[in-house]
A protein has these predicted regions:
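Non-catalytic, well-ordered alpha-helical segments in soluble enzyme domains
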Residues: 87-89, 250-264
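Intrinsically disordered, low-complexity segments enriched in small polar residues
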Residues: 1, 6-10, 24-27, 34-37
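Intrinsic low-complexity, disordered N-terminal segments enriched in polar/charged/small residues
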Residues: 17, 26-31, 36, 42-45
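PAPS-dependent sulfotransferase catalytic domain
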Residues: 59-237, 296, 303-336
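Short acidic/His-enriched helical or mixed secondary-structure segments at domain edges of catalytic enzymes
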Residues: 276-298
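Phosphate-binding beta-loop-alpha motif at adenosine-nucleotide cofactor sites
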Residues: 69, 232-257
């Protein structure tokens, strides 16, 4: 089959889109030229061809996303902070605001800043969905591995997939007991437990700004199953409870996974150092002193960070509702 693409030189995103097309099959590339090209015109055409060749060459090196995915309040921020501490220079002191960088896409995906940069109408959720992969193409323009936070379900809406192997190298999916998620999430968003459970049970559940939908969560079970069943790239599933109760071995497992899919180097002394730097109590003290951009409506983002807090917070009736609603997944994960 033949497809035709035209190129406007200097548009890196367009070049990348072209490379994606070239990789999928035979292609004819048309570069507009003047009827009587001058020496300067010819030189520019040659430069275009060389530039395309360069882009194709660097695209062969994997420059992909590793998702840091979770339902809200499941340990995503802690994981990002640990990884930031681990991969920064050994003599650098970790600071709470250090995660607010492009390297770790702390604002999450989809990102309002990227939507604005690409002139995508973020007031229409359908436009956000349509451009999921375009935004990921944009992130991957830096030609390196990108850790990207997301609370989005690994879903398909109409013909649009949340991601594919073209942009995704792998992912770490964090899962937490839904009873603890409910307690923590309700404090974060300022809703009562019953209303929060209704949101967590709905397949039509979104993270939104005051004016528009941004992230499709779905129900807690939908979310977990969508990432568990993603087959295009290997996804590592980590329980928040293991992060808390078997911290060193769990983070070692994460780094072993990263060494398998990327070129991460495992250094047990660095793991211990980074765990000390990002210990919950230390993060809590830093937040009290410095504040934290991700804080919701609760007094602190790093509120408790414990496992099993639901036992002292939820009524027996509400606990049973959660266990009935998510019984299959909770049994599978060992929560029941």
């Amino acid at each position: 089959s033949r497809r035709v693409a035209s190129l406007g030189f200097g548009n890196a995103l367009l070049v990348r889109a072209l490379i994606r097309k070239l990789a999928s099959g035979p292609e004819i590339l048309i570069i507009a030229t003047p009827e009587a090209p001058t020496a300067v015109d010819k030189a520019q055409i040659v430069m275009k061809i060389l530039y395309i060749e360069f882009c194709i060459r660097i695209s062969l090196k994997y420059n992909m996303i590793i998702w840091l995915a979770s339902y809200p309040k499941s340990g995503n921020t802690w994981l990002r902070m640990f990884l930031k501490s681990y991969f920064q220079k050994s003599d650098t002191e970790f600071k709470l605001q250090d995660t607010i960088t492009d390297d770790f896409q702390s604002k999450g995906f989809p990102s309002l800043s990227i939507l604005k940069h690409l002139n995508i109408d973020y007031f229409k959720f359908s436009e956000v969905v349509k451009n999921w992969e375009l935004m990921q193409d944009f992130i991957n323009l830096n030609n390196k591995t990108n850790f990207v936070k997301t609370h989005n379900s690994m879903c398909t809406i109409g013909p649009y997939k949340f991601t594919s192997s073209r942009n995704t190298l792998g992912g770490i999916y964090l899962i937490r007991d839904p009873r603890d998620v409910l307690v923590s999430y309700s404090h974060h968003v300022g809703l009562d437990y019953q209303t929060t459970l209704e949101h967590m049970s709905s397949s039509d559940n979104y993270e939104s700004t005051t004016t528009h939908k941004m992230t499709l969560l779905g129900s807690w079970a939908d979310h977990y199953n969508s990432w568990k069943n993603y087959k295009s790239s290997k996804i590592l599933i980590i329980k928040y409870e293991d992060m808390v109760l078997d911290t060193f071995n769990t983070f070692l497992k994460i780094l072993k996974y990263l060494s398998e899919i990327d070129d991460a180097i495992i250094d047990e002394n660095k793991i211990k150092r980074s765990l000390k730097q990002t210990a919950f109590g230390r993060l809590q003290k830093m937040e009290k002193k410095q504040g934290f951009i991700e804080k919701g409506k609760s007094e602190l983002f790093f509120r408790k960070g414990k496992t099993g807090a639901w036992k002292n917070e939820l009524s027996v009736d509400l606990s049973k509702k959660i266990e009935k609603k998510f019984n299959k997944e909770m049994v599978e994960l060992g929560y029941l």
